[in-house]
Structure formats: C-alpha cells, structure tokens
Amino acid sequence: MIQVIIQPGSIQVAGHAGAGPPGYDLVCAAVSTLVQTFVRSAEQLTDTQLHSDIAPGGAFVRYEESPQVQLLADSFFVGVQGVAEAYPQCVQVLDRRERRAEALTAEKQGRYSPNE
C-alpha cells in the first residue's frame, strides 16, 4: 500500500501499490506522476524554496508555504485523493494540514466556501 502524508510544508509518500508488476503498476504511476508534477510546478512556477528526495518506493518533499505553493499542494491533494478513492486498497492519504481540516469542518457546517 502507498501511504501519502500531507503536512504543513511537506509531503511524504512511501510504499508500493501492488496493483501490478514493477514498471506496470498504474496506481504507482499515477501517484508518482502527481508527486513529480507538484515538485516541478513548485520549482518552475513559484519562487518558493523546495527540497525533494524522490526514489523508487518513496518521496519526501519539503517546501516553504506560500499561497502559490499551497494551491499546488491542494491540487496534489485533490489528485491523490481521487486515486485513493478509486483504489482504496492501494493508497491511503493522511491530511495533517490544520488549515485544510478546519476548512473541511467549516464547509460541512456551512461556514466556508472554497470560492471565498
């Protein structure tokens, strides 16, 4: 199983989906693509300092929080959550960003709209 942990200023990915043979696992490929897109987008589209260590079976990304990078991190979260919903036996996502948890709680209570 792939475990994705999203925290303020960092993303960690560890494990293998086990949904296919090495090199042919579409779930691993999807998560890897999302991680690499986040890193490349943050590096090329923002002025934020970023450190990444990406290797087979895992990735660790640490970044300075800014509105631009937060939007990219939110986009990464949406994508990886979609993969986890489609393949719950292969991917687990833990969102430990306080701001995100508060926003979801407020949205459920009708106090927050993502468009605000």
Label each region the model flagged.
Residues M1-L26, T33-E116:
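N-terminal intrinsically disordered, cationic/polar leader segments
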